[in-house]
Amino acid sequence: MPANRPVQPPRTATEIGPTLHTYHRLPGPLSIVLLGVLQILVWGGSFFLMAVMADPISRDTGWPSQWVYGALSLSLMVSALLAPLSSRLVARYGGRPQMAASGAVVAVGLLIMAASHTLGLFLLAWAVIGIGMAMGLYEALFATLGGLYGEGAGKAITGITLIAGFASTLSWPTVALAIEHFGWRATCVCYALVLMVVVAPLYWRVLPAGGRVEVPAKTPAKGETLGVDRQLYWLLTSMFAIGAIIMTAIAVQLVAVLQGLGHSLPVAIGLAAMLGPSQVASRVLQILAGKRHPIWTALAWVSLVLIGLLMVTFIPAATAVGLLVFGCGNGLRAIVRGLLPLAMMPPAQYVLLMGRMSRPSLIGQALTPVVGGFLFEHFGSMGVLLTLCLLALTNVLLVTVVMRRVRAAPRVV
């Protein structure tokens, strides 16, 4: 080294980026099942609730249906705003306290909703539920698992998403039956009690303490990616956002779109019901396929989604098959969201960035019902489907770009 060049002191861990403590042993099958059940409970009491509760609420209160459905968009927007903070709290304190508290926060929102007799209080309830969603849904859980188990978290994520894939299949008929017998307000109270009694004790029992990340004392600046390649970061973020938009549009508008294509309401509902089992089936097949780089799962996800949408759009006689193909692809989305970033960046960065990467997805989900409603009103079912096909094609192109990065370097930091 030339004499006139000063020797640089070694950088500390916080200057280089976040670092992790020792990882824990992977959870056993029973723990994975319990974590999946907990996700079903929290998803069912938040994101999936409005699908069966919005109409009874609107009929009972007289509030405009667009405001009732808009409450879910509000909760998603709140969750989007808080998602980066959620990941940072997981990194600083470990995920167990936050995951355990998430059920209680959603429960408080449900209790406020049950007591709401004004639209303003109802919207406040969903803002509180949005806080609980940021604390306890997939992104927070994936960050928690990454902090606890490092690269080994992939196995747990796959198993948990397999079980949690039954969230809508189980929660919709259960909540609908409860509303029929007890009314929507009593159903909210009962669901809140279940969350308060079950979620915190089980999370505290199943998740080990720890998983904290040594983070910089200064909050990372906006747009900072903590040493992760910026182009890769935005490629992954864009992929997940587009996937979330497509999923939300289908979840909200599929029945109406199918009716617009000429199917009766019972047939449309029957076709839509095929999505849940096909999503779970694809996750089972992914497990049976064995260990491989998740970029191949990502390619299967976006390809099947595109093929399924094209079949529904252009081959009316193959609508049922197209929805099965779409469901198989969409079922892989949650697995890819958890596994692909973990394979492309060190676990410590993964813990901190999961929440930030989810923000565009959540904002897109919040805006999708409004934009989708506009497209459906002005351009009909074909307008909605063609837009979704273009988005799905874009995702295929994005995955091919990421695949080139994987072949060049299995991990890009």
Where are these regions (language model features)?
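Helix-loop-helix hairpin linking two adjacent transmembrane segments in secondary transporters
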Residues: 159-210
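Intracellular juxtamembrane helix-capping segments at the cytosolic ends
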Residues: 135-149, 332-345
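Hydrophobic core of transmembrane alpha-helices in multi-pass small-molecule transporters
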Residues: 40, 120-136, 241, 319-332
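A late C-terminal transmembrane helix in Major Facilitator Superfamily
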Residues: 168, 347-380
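Helix-to-loop junctions at the C-terminal end of transmembrane segments
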Residues: 82-95, 282-294, 376
